[in-house]
Amino acid sequence: MSLGESLMKPTAMLYRNLVAMEVEESIRGYPIDAVVLLGGCDKTVPAQLMGAAGADVPAIALTGGPANPAIFRGRELGVGTDLWGYVNELRAGRMSQSDFDELEAASMPSVGHCPELGTASTMAALTE
């Protein structure tokens, strides 16, 4: 299950709740006594916890941890914050598509959740 929340309307929280319902129904739909939750985002981890709580089964949650910092042309990027600024630069014609493609390729250099100190890190710490 994944939330591709780019430009989501009306709100990403609606989709977090839908994922929580999907997790709960997936747990209820199989004859299991407990569940291991693997997640790593500020919406998916809470959704998994909400779903497991709703299904009322024992659960262990493991988060993926933060990704390595993203570097673009010698500058560290905030994946969630800086990327939106570059999208605006692209839309305004101040950045070429090939430069944006290069930025996009550099934006997530390893596995893990968004590396900046944000809600994904907070949710991982709270979950652990």
PLM regions with names:
Residues M13-E128:
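Active-site cavity-forming subdomains of large catalytic enzyme subunits
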Residues M1-L14:
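Anionic-ligand anchoring segments at beta-strand to alpha-helix junctions in alpha/beta enzyme folds, i.e.
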